[in-house]
Amino acid sequence: MQLDLKTIVNVQVNLASRSAARKGFNVALILGPSKAISTGERVKIYTSVAAMLQDGFTTDNPEYTAASLYFSATSGPTKLAVGAKGEAESFLAAAKACREKNGEWYVLIPLEAKDADILQLAEWAEAASPDTLLAYTTSDDSNLSNTVTGEVGEQTDAIFKRLKSKNYRRSFGMYSGTSHAVAAVMGYAMGQNTGLNNSAFTLAYKKLPGVVTDDLSETQVQYVCGDSETAGVNGNVYVRRSDAYDVLQEGCMADGTYFDEVLNLDMLKNEIVLSVMDLLTSQPKIPDTEPGVNSIVAVINTACEKFVNSGFIAPGVWNGGTVLTLKNGTTLDAGYIVLSEPVADQSQADRDARKAPPIYVCIKTAGAIHYVTIAVNVNR
């Protein structure tokens, strides 16, 4: 009779758990009225306008026009979500339904939305989960100067100024005579956002294939976008400079924050959350000790390092105020530092509740240069 070897040699194979899939932050959703997609299906993903035509869209549909601009971006976006809006449905209700149906898209582009719709969507985007941005196009000339619209007694500011006054960080507005021009901007952003080394970007001064530049005065551009010295109403325009350069200005959200900063901070937050969750689910337990907390700090360090490699985080001097032992004027050689409060200082209530001591992630962004002043000194 042959006896089993496992009483002498017992081998257990432990297969490492899979990490959660990282959201790409590289897909926009176009929301329009065409009926090629039913409200029951609600959202479909496309890789080309040809696929949209095969699915029942026509070249006359606004979704097709916007998608053509999106896929024409020089950065080569690979995917676009298209959402359905019911005939009697509000843009807000449709956007919420699209988000419930599909959580992977990042930027919402409503087609032919009125100012009232944009205001509702902008408010929703500020708190939507997962993180969401709103990008819209307006051809309303009242956005080009400090004017109000409407009847006397019911006058309102133009949409750029109204969203700026609300300090909305998740709304990107573009003035353009080209229908759905903002789709071209988001096509560039979603295609460029690969997460690879040195892939960080800014939207300022980018060329937008398919979008016609608007004939605006310097005063109008300054009112909308501002410049290195003055603030505008934080809109965006596409203009020609010096008969040679067709450029987008300035790449800002309604509160003045640059688009790329909002995008990368959303991505960093997502990476940290998933990295820590992967750690918690892959270990028998994380002890409430300094080594245990250090294991959490280690995965956060790894997450931050990805954004050093992409070019969003870079070495620099910290001027963000005192955080534990970090003081203003300290050089962050890595571009970031992760600090935690001592386990010994933890309250008994937090320890009993199995809460980790507070952890602080301090980063220095690489920033970007949009304006240059040059002095030419000549000696005869």
Where are these regions (language model features)?
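Surface-exposed assembly/interface segments
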Residues: M1-R380
